[in-house]
Amino acid sequence: MRTLPPPLPPRSRPRRLVVSTVAAAALAITTAVALPQSAGAAETSPIGFGAGTTGGGGASAVTVSTLAAFKTAVTGNTAKVVRVSGLISLTGQVDIGSNTTVLGVGSSSGFTGGGLRLKEVTNVVIRNLNISKPVAPSDGVTVQKSTKVWIDHNSFSADRDHDKDYYDGLLDINHGSDNVTVSWNTFKDHFKGSLAGHSDNNASEDTGHLKITYHHNHFSNVYSRIPSLRFGTGHFYDNYVEGADTAVHSRMGAQMLVENNVFRTTKIAVTTNRSSDVDGYANLRGNDLGGAATEVSQVGSFTSAPYGYSAEPASSVVASVTSGAGAGKL
């Protein structure tokens, strides 16, 4: 395969190396961490690449329970906090304006049948929502040409009773979006988890962008794209993945730092050499692979995140994530 120069300092491409489960475990580096996040302790602001995202901030909240009222409430770029009460059926996606917080009420509010779209906006928080069965071509949440986004404590789900293309992605981030944190969410029963970077042919728009942090998420019975990242820089830490075929996928020169995650009943925990003409890069440390294999053809230069964070050891991740991730856990 040809090699795309990495977004961080260039390096010569190493010979392809497929790392076995045993070798990966032996090479795992124990990361130095501060105090671990306590289970379910919801942050008041995002950690990671999405740091500084405030959404509607301290704006007075409005509560809606119908689709018409929701569409009106999230329109425009003035600061706003919109509370969703109950489950609203969609047949497509609703566009969300800049400087918006969308917050579910209780543990069972949200949307089904479609999703939310963040297109050419900035400073948006999506929190405490149930988002289910986004019928194609709608994603559960689409982040497109947008910056400063926090996706936190939501429950995304579909089913695997239909063809893999019947539903679209649960969370897709594309078209040069940047500075995104995805934290404390559950992703369940789907073929396609989170696609970051939609096409091998979109280097001109995506290179230097798609900086995304995924932490403390639970992926259960999700076949692949956990996440799939092209061109960008991804930090995937303290996540719990079970029942996947292919989990973390770095491609088209993307840089992935994968640390302190737990994988169970998963075939391939990390791959850098599938499905694209250009391999990605990955660094692994402190992970509990649980018997999963890794396919790391290129070790990357992204070894240290450019922000402060407290990663907990893999030994406590399952307890923290299963008790703290998803809607209704704020």
Regions found by a protein language model. Give the residues of each.
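Right-handed parallel beta-helix
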Residues: 99-105, 122-133, 145-161, 177-198, ...
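Post-signal peptide N-terminal regions of Sec-secreted extracellular proteins
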Residues: 42-58, 96-98, 160-164, 188-192, ...
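Glycine-rich beta-solenoid repeat tracts in large extracellular/virion proteins
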Residues: 93-96, 110, 114-120, 138-145, ...
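Acidic Gly/Asp/Thr-rich repetitive segments characteristic of extracellular carbohydrate-active
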Residues: 47-83
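Extracellular beta-strand-rich solenoid/capping regions of secreted or surface-exposed proteins
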Residues: 71-78, 86-103, 109-128, 132-147, ...
